[in-house]
Regions:
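N-terminal strand-loop element at the rim of the active site
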Residues: 16-23, 36, 40-87, 188, ...
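A conserved mid-protein helix/loop that constitutes part of the nucleotide-sugar donor-binding site
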Residues: 24-32, 217, 226-240, 348
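Short, structured helix-loop element that forms part of the nucleotide-activated donor/catalytic region
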Residues: 54-60, 251-276, 363
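Short His-centered aromatic/hydrophobic patch
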Residues: 114-120, 138
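Donor nucleotide-sugar binding/catalytic pocket of nucleotide-sugar-dependent glycosyltransferases
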Residues: 158, 165-207
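Aromatic "clamp/platform" in nucleotide-sugar-dependent glycosyltransferases that forms part
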Residues: 283, 302
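Short hydrophobic beta-strand element within catalytic cores of glycosyltransferases
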Residues: 319-323
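Conserved acidic donor-binding segment of nucleotide-sugar-dependent glycosyltransferases
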Residues: 334-336, 340-347, 356-362, 376
């Protein structure tokens, strides 16, 4: 069976994303999914990036995945501002679209999947003349697309961003299939059978429950240093925790995605509070080791589409304390059994929940055991069978 070769043409799957040099959850699960699809022998898998520029992948990808980098730096150049940059942005957009269309024409895929939600990607794929099924993967809930507008103070910029987001949502709705991460997101789109819910999968699931008897006095959180993740709220929470439990520490591991603004704000908040037990770390590929050095996980996000970090932490036997934000936490955490859910953005309630978790050791251990068992359903073999059924149906 190992030498079996199908006598039919393999279905060609083309995946389009910005780059694979980030250490974020999207890149982590995508690298695994593409590798497993290619290794299955059922598909010819193509990964197309446009901003990799020779940088190494953050996560390993099978050699059986065909890789193409368009090397246009389109997204980076679109962030330039000023009168003289307008022409450069226009030229880069045209160059990018031509390069992508040439690439797709050469591959002639059966399925084209947009992984990143950039307007240029979406419009280029939608306008590209082909019989291929066009798929968009939404890693952010529908209403959450507007959440980032809250931090924009300039009315002109806010209105401009709102219009762009409206265009993105309209373009997404034109795709043949929309893949979301939770059933709540699926119902919010209200587009019938064209919307499919497929959750993220675990990269790794320990065969045995990790030993959680050693007390570390450490709480962990993992994610980008960005407004979405609510780390500013978490630092305010920790000011309250520090008064009751100064022997406990908070460790945040995150990437910057080229923007240090949010991280610098957090550093100022920590310095102003004079807390010595809050630590901001760079993102790490050894995140499971960090989970195992911690007692429980806290999520302070303003919104989440799923929360890959939640199931990762739970697979290590960590219970969760989280805001009950849209959309992910409630679809994963059973309140009182595998963790504690606090009202969205309620600093006081989240602090109370963290204190409860600290002060009730036996209950924390029990929740951790329940958490480990509950996320077995996200093992790769189960989630990949759902993906394969999806691709075979197209």
């Amino acid at each position: 069976m190992d030498n079996f070769k199908p006598c039919y043409a393999l279905k060609k799957l083309a995946f389009l994303c910005n780059n694979m040099k980030s250490t974020n959850g999207v890149e982590r699960v995508l690298s695994q999914r593409l590798s497993l699809l290619a290794e299955s022998g059922m598909y010819e898998v193509y990964l197309i990036t446009y901003n990799q520029y020779g940088a190494p992948f953050s996560f390993p990808i099978s050699d059986k995945v065909h890789y193409i980098d368009l090397a246009t730096r389109y997204i980076e150049r679109c962030s330039y501002h000023g009168l003289f940059q307008y022409l450069d942005r226009l030229i880069s957009k045209i160059t990018y679209k031509k390069a992508l269309c040439r690439c797709l024409s050469k591959i002639n895929p059966d399925v084209i999947s947009c992984v990143d939600i950039h307007l240029a990607d979406l419009t280029t794929v939608i306008d590209y003349p082909t019989n291929a099924t066009k798929v968009v993967e939404c890693h952010c809930g529908l209403s959450a697309y507007y959440a980032d507008l809250e931090k924009i103070r300039n009315p002109y910029k806010k209105n401009k961003e709102r219009k762009i987001k409206e265009m993105i949502i309209h373009t997404i709705s034109r795709f043949d299939r929309i893949v979301v991460l939770t059933e709540d997101e699926k119902s919010e789109w209200d587009l019938g059978d064209k919307v499919v819910s497929i959750p993220n999968m675990l990269i790794y699931y320990p065969e045995n429950l990790p030993d959680r008897t050693t007390l570390h006095h450490r709480v962990i959180s993992v994610g980008r240093y960005a407004y979405q993740k609510g780390y500013d709220l978490l630092i305010d929470v920790w000011k309250l925790i520090n008064k009751r439990h100064p022997d406990w520490s908070l460790h945040i591991y995150g990437s910057h995605d080229g923007d240090m603004g949010d991280c610098n704000q957090l550093k100022r908040m920590i310095a102003d509070s004079q807390m010595k037990n809050v630590f901001l770390h760079e993102a790490t590929n050894e995140v499971y080791a960090k989970y195992n050095e911690s007692d429980f996980y806290v999520m302070s996000s303003r919104y989440e589409s799923f929360g890959l970090v939640l199931i990762e932490a739970m697979s290590c036997g960590l219970p969760i304390v989280s805001f009950d934000c849209k959309y992910g936490p409630r679809s994963i955490i059973v309140d009182g059994e595998t963790g504690i859910l606090a009202p969205p953005s309620d600093v006081k309630k989240l602090a109370e929940s963290i204190s409860y978790m600290i002060e009730h050791t036996d209950e924390r251990m029990s929740m951790g055991r329940n958490a480990y068992t509950s996320v077995a359903k996200y093992k790769p073999e189960r989630i990949m069978s759902i993906w394969q059924q999806f691709y075979q149906s197209l």
